[in-house]
């Protein structure tokens, strides 16, 4: 029964694959929980810096920092693109890249030059053939990236802004809504659109050393760095949740395939047995 042997081989192969995808699903679920914890832990940091900057800027409105000045006409833009290093996470990266490309095409149609920085192997491989100026590449950050890992890359882009090479800097990443929903997002970093601060109708009467302007400049850079890091940890949360869902779907599909093949195998085996019985009966009748 050659057909039956082939089917049994297929069933065995699919079951082995099912074990692998099931294990990957459990690993992704564990990593997703840790990534979500890091994401939630980093949010208060951004909010606190935003609050301090809001009070400081309100108290010293005479400061006109370049990072807080709005543009009259946009001629160049820089985008920090955050993706995963690994695949097997559904359409997470593809959806983000399509969203970014639509924006890039729109910018270029309006005569706006686009420079990019890629974080993650998938973004690096995808965008290297689109003729965009890649100012920096950062990969292999792992599942638990440190804040300091991003500083060099962010500095390159901010230096481009300071030198006038780019007039606007944004970060593109997948925003984590919940386990099932991840939203491709492009968030403007500089010029800073708005700084949210509670109770902004008063300001703190502090003495700043060396002076308030230098403190504000340092905090603005730190705030931008914190926003990029927040985007990175959110993207990692999206990656792990997407991978968990993709592996669960693969595991379920493997189970369905095994059931179908087992049904086909049983039918083929039943047909073979029926044929053998018929041949035996026919042979007996002929002998009589």
Swiss-Prot record:
It comes from Vesicomyosocius okutanii subsp. Calyptogena okutanii (strain HA). One of its GO terms (molecular function) is proton-transporting ATP synthase activity, rotational mechanism. GO terms for cellular component: plasma membrane; proton-transporting ATP synthase complex. Keywords: ATP synthesis, Cell inner membrane, Cell membrane, CF(1), Hydrogen ion transport, Ion transport, Membrane, Transport. Pfam families: ATP-synt. Coiled coil: none annotated. NCBIfam families: ATPsyn_F1gamma, PRK05621.1-1. The lineage of its organism: Bacteria, Pseudomonadati, Pseudomonadota, Gammaproteobacteria, Candidatus Pseudothioglobaceae. F-type ATPases have 2 components, CF(1) - the catalytic core - and CF(0) - the membrane proton channel. CF(1) has five subunits: alpha(3), beta(3), gamma(1), delta(1), epsilon(1). CF(0) has three main subunits: a, b and c. This is ATP synthase gamma chain. PANTHER family: ATP SYNTHASE GAMMA CHAIN (PTHR11693), ATP SYNTHASE SUBUNIT GAMMA, MITOCHONDRIAL (PTHR11693:SF22). Belongs to the ATPase gamma chain family. It comes from the Bacteria. InterPro entries: ATP_synth_F1_ATPase_gsu (IPR035968), ATP_synth_F1_gsu (IPR000131). It is found in: Cell inner membrane. One of its GO terms (biological process) is proton motive force-driven plasma membrane ATP synthesis. The keyword Cell membrane applies. Produces ATP from ADP in the presence of a proton gradient across the membrane. The gamma chain is believed to be important in regulating ATPase activity and the flow of protons through the CF(0) complex. It is a peripheral membrane protein. The keyword Membrane applies.
